[in-house]
């Protein structure tokens, strides 16, 4: 009986550790997603501004 009880405790500990590891992994994944989203948005904005500035410079030449 004591062996079955220790197996149950070990199983509970293993499932708890698995949940903790998965939670930490999810937090890292979510943090990296937010970080890359902010970087991509800033890159998109700077590219958009650069394109608008080149269009405004080229517009008088075409006339």
Swiss-Prot record:
The chain crosses the membrane at residues 20-40. It is a single-pass membrane protein. Induction: By heat shock (shift from 30 to 45 degrees Celsius) (at protein level). One of its GO terms (cellular component) is plasma membrane. InterPro entries: YfgG. Pfam families: DUF2633. One of its GO terms (biological process) is stress response to nickel ion. Keywords: Cell inner membrane, Cell membrane, Membrane, Stress response, Transmembrane, Transmembrane helix. It is found in: Cell inner membrane. Its main location: membrane. It comes from the Bacteria. This is Protein YfgG.
């Amino acid at each position: 009986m004591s062996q079955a009880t220790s197996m149950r405790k070990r199983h509970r500990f293993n499932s708890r550790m698995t949940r903790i590891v998965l939670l930490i992994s999810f937090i890292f994944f979510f943090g990296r997603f937010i970080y890359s989203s902010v970087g991509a948005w800033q890159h998109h904005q700077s590219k958009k501004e650069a394109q608008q500035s080149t269009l405004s410079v080229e517009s008088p030449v075409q006339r």
